[in-house]
Amino acid sequence: PDTSSATTITLSGSSASASGSASSNVKVDGGTVTISGGGTYVISGELSNGRIVVNAPKADVRLVLKGATITSSDGPAIDIQDAGNAIVVLAKDSKNTLTDGASYASGQEATAALFSSDTLTVTGTGQLDVTGSYKDGISSKNGLIITGNATITVKAADDGLRGKDYLVVESGTLTVEAGGDALKSSEGDDETKGFISLGKASITLTSSDDAIAATTDVTVKDTTLTITAGGGQANATVEEQAPPGQE
């Protein structure tokens, strides 16, 4: 993406600084960096104990991780609490690491190292290593979409990737090691949701429970899939067909 007009957030140990066009939307309080407005934010450096919080209702927020290492001791590394459209971009040739705490401070909705209350898209061509020490690795309370040509590795105490409404892995390389389910979509009140769709990606799943756990359908199309699961390969029928809307 064009980041020439982006706001730069530089992480440095237990603090951070922001510069650029929308830096007024960035508040730094110790190790907590809160983004309150739309725009593109390029994040680099290392945060030894802190998190990125997005609270920008109805705004389009793009977080470009460009060599970012974020470790939180008592919550998520990235917590997208409210946004109209949330995208995490893994910059070309970058290596990024997100690690959450094994226990969270009380009153938090988040359950994952990379958490979003709204639909979340993860894209780009860089590398992302996620350790979900508390529960999940990457989780969205709505939909979760993995696209681009990124290399993503997730280790999670519970579920690896969880999109409550749906989980779509369109492309890229994904490796998941999960104490619960590797890939999960759990919405059960709407029959058009709760599905998992896997496209032209290379996916390796190791899980103590199900590798692929969907409430409704699992579709697999041109996917290179390697599974080692304790609870079985999937709890839904796996069909070789195009995902919804892509026939």
Task: For the regions a language model picked out, list residue spans one by one.
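A composition-driven surface/loop motif
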Residues: 1-247
